[in-house]
Amino acid sequence: MDLTRTLIIGNSGSGKSWLAQRLAEQLCVPWTDLDRIHWLSDEHSIPRPRNEALGMARGAASEERWVIEGVYGWIVSEILHRATALIWLCIDDVDCVANIRRREAEAKDDERLLAMLEWAGSYHTRDDSSGCAAHQRLFEGFTDSKTQLMDRAEITDFFGAIRNTG
């Protein structure tokens, strides 16, 4: 698998950031989290203007080597043509929600967290560019190297294999 420019998609809480960070370190390439492009603040409450976000994503994807990860299909569709590899983390919604709860253990059940949990819990039924059906279309349309990982064990094994060959 040619990981020169790797794009990782999947639900919130699926492990995209975990895998992206480790791949980027292993491959010595920059890592871009599309949350940092889509949102103006760390609270994920104010979205960046669409054209500005797309411009930032295109800029990151114009580099020679990278790992980019995110849930936003409307952004991914604009940069997918630059990727040499696509990794889809298609993890069960219940596992994604549990992972978010672990990750946000210090957070109180505020409105933002509850909204994120509800959104992650609807990945397989959502009919928007960030839902499972949209990610499946992106995955099926991608003609270069790609893999679909269905659970955390597969994600860990995939990274272990990359680490052992690098």
PLM region descriptions:
Residues 90-134:
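A glycine- and Lys/Arg-enriched "phosphate-lid" helix/loop adjacent to the NTP-binding pocket
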Residues 15:
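Conserved glycine(s) of the Walker
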Residues 18-64:
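Conserved substrate/cofactor phosphate-moiety recognition/catalytic segment
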Residues 8:
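Hydrophobic anchor at the beta1->P-loop junction of P-loop NTPases
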Residues 12:
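The conserved Walker
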Residues 5:
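Walker A (P-loop) ATP-phosphate-binding motif of ABC ATPase nucleotide-binding domains
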